[in-house]
Amino acid sequence: KGFGDSCVVGLNEALKTDANIIALTECDGTYSGSDLQKMIPYLDNCEVVLGTRLIQVLIEKENQNGIFNTWGNYFIAKLIQLKYFSIQHMGVVSLTDVGCTFRCIRRDGLEKMIERITNDYDKKIDKNGWLIIPYLNMIAIEKDLKIVEVPITFKKRTGGASKSGAERKSKGL
């Protein structure tokens, strides 16, 4: 059915288990499971840990994130920060990479989000697209969940070409 649908179904299925931590990732070899060791400890202090692919020393050269993805994700991240800005704390969250799928969510955090994810998804989000990922971030913010980004390893895709068309879009620019 599509990437977005897979994410929503996967998150709903995860809540049918007894898992206390839910990790969301892609199966194309771009993310390293060993990064979970960096991410999980943050769940002691927050409900959502997002990966960020913007730390150069952790990024494999010639990966699929071209200028369109890198700067587009960063720009959208800053727009989301402005939307939820709090003058008291210089914002409620600091985001740099809203297109990164790799994340860990505590069960209690996902339970607060899941109804909205499922209901809104059917009405607002393209089932084939990647927009579910930044939308998950926005729902977490709106549900007052604590969110932190952690630098992760990002490797060249091993599972074939992207289905999102971002590479074609960037060439069109």
Write out the residue ranges for each language-model feature.
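Acidic metal-phosphate-binding loop of nucleotide-sugar-dependent transferases
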Residues: 29-31
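Residues that recognize and position ribonucleotide moieties
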Residues: 69, 103, 129-130, 148
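Catalytic donor-sugar/metal-binding loop of nucleotide-sugar-dependent glycosyltransferases
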Residues: 134-155
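Acidic donor-binding loop at a coil-to-helix junction in glycosyltransferase catalytic cores
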Residues: 124-135
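Acceptor/aglycone-binding surface of glycosyltransferases and processive sugar-polymer synthases
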Residues: 3-16, 21, 33-121, 157-166, ...
